[in-house]
Amino acid sequence: MSKKPVALIILDGFAMRDEAKGNAVAQANKPNFDRYWNQYPHALLKADGEAVGLPEGQMGNSEVGHLNIGAGRIVYQSLTRVNLSIREGEFFENETFLNAMNHVKEKGSSLHIYGLVSDGGIHSHINHLYALLELAKREQVERVYIHGFLDGRDVGPTSAESYLVDLEAKMKELGVGELATLHGRYYAMDRDKRWDRVEKSYRAMVYGEGPAYSSALDVIKDSYENSIHDEFVIPSVITNEDGSPVATIEDDDAIIFFNFRPDRAIQMSQVFTNKDFRGFDRGEKLPQNVYYVCLTHFSETVQGDVAFKPTNLDNTLGEVLAQQNYKQLRIAETEKYPHVTFFFSGGREEPFPGEERILIDSPKVATYDLKPEMSAYEVTDALLNEIEADKHDVIILNFANPDMVGHSGMLEPTIKAVEAVDECLGKVVDAILAKGGAAVITADHGNADEVVTLEGKPMTAHTTNKVPVIVTEEGLNLREDGILADLSPTVLDLLGGKQPAEMTGKTLIK
């Protein structure tokens, strides 16, 4: 097949759901979408959970959706990547972890593990801590100390006790590990250069300074009695019977920071890894020759080893089109412009050769329910001029409305948003067809399909419903088990282009 131009049209936040109540997609008058759906081959795609590299059951979002679509493969997010490595056993063979453990065995020193002790799944997951304890046991590391950062933000504000009880039970079961300090994340995980907070955590871990308690649960009990919840627990030291700290970080020790999200892990990591650190005076007991491990790549400014190194996304659709000398256009309004450029290109800022970009300003309104059409008409007018000029072989287009207005949790404006997009969709697709081209009409995740719950409450979050895909080419059959990663291979199939090995998605065309 060799169709040109091929337009990949992403209706942001537009998924399919049988229940019409609270469903702006179902209730909207959308003659163009319905016409294409009835006339052309169509299917539903999974756009959530493990199909897009997230934990099972987790709703997709625009960043993840565009990453997967543009990459033509499942792009595993950090949480899922680590979970999978534990499940498949690679975690326990990770060279960086083993280096840290060998370091302390050779030096006769201690392994310190710190991070956010919860299952919030935003910055960390307690299961990753458990896996590290299991690994320490396997590797026969004798002295393992945990410095627990307490959450209270991505989980309940007073939930720390349940996590600490579970952790104590896990350490007892394995016969490995001891809690040495506890810190509210407000201190240990600051990201705004409030170094006085980070210093309190540092001094607890290195100097054994701070409120002292004989057990972790005493820290929690005392904090709650003083109306201090998990996030704000003052960095506290757990002591032995003789009043000495259970452990402090010393020369030749190793540290593993098990948070996977970088932003709140950078500052604490800089304290221990950077020779020219200027945030505060680390004092003469600054530990030397510490083997420091970051779970993921935190920042160029952190001089530690990385256990799960970044995966470079080579041969995304944009790069493949450039290599095969196809001209491409990326077009969206402000709200979704980064998605059709940076995220679609696998985290690359600069355009590929032969790639043109058009940014249309989003309207300046407080909230988009006040202007549900947003800038869809302006995007469409600009695109129709481009199609008429025959400049591009491939067009990547995003209509932001169903998602951005859907976030309002207001049904009527979201219906209007879907109707405006449908009007624009008709103009664009008909112009593409008139040029002898083909359109792939799809979405990145759900939202407008459930704006109000069955109980009548506003629903502002994304949904896990499947998204549509229509290929405007009669006589084709589409697979029913597709995912977002299959869209780029489908575009290449329509163009008659070659699919690279890195793209593990499969064309939807049977």
UniProtKB/Swiss-Prot annotation:
Pathway(s) where this gene product acts: Carbohydrate degradation; glycolysis; pyruvate from D-glyceraldehyde 3-phosphate: step 3/5
Keyword annotations of the record: Glycolysis, Isomerase, Manganese, Metal-binding, Phosphoprotein, Sporulation
CDD domains: iPGM
Catalyzed chemical reaction(s): (2R)-2-phosphoglycerate = (2R)-3-phosphoglycerate
Cofactor remark: Binds 2 manganese ions per subunit.
Residues of the active site: S62 (phosphoserine intermediate)
Residues modified as Phosphotyrosine: Y36
Pfam families: iPGM_N, Metalloenzyme
Residue positions binding substrate: H123, R153, D154, R185, R191, R261, P262, D263, R264, K336
Cofactor(s) required, per the database record: Mn(2+)
Subunit architecture: Monomer.
PANTHER family xrefs: 2,3-BISPHOSPHOGLYCERATE-INDEPENDENT PHOSPHOGLYCERATE MUTASE (PTHR31637:SF0)
This protein's name: 2,3-bisphosphoglycerate-independent phosphoglycerate mutase
The encoding gene: gpmI
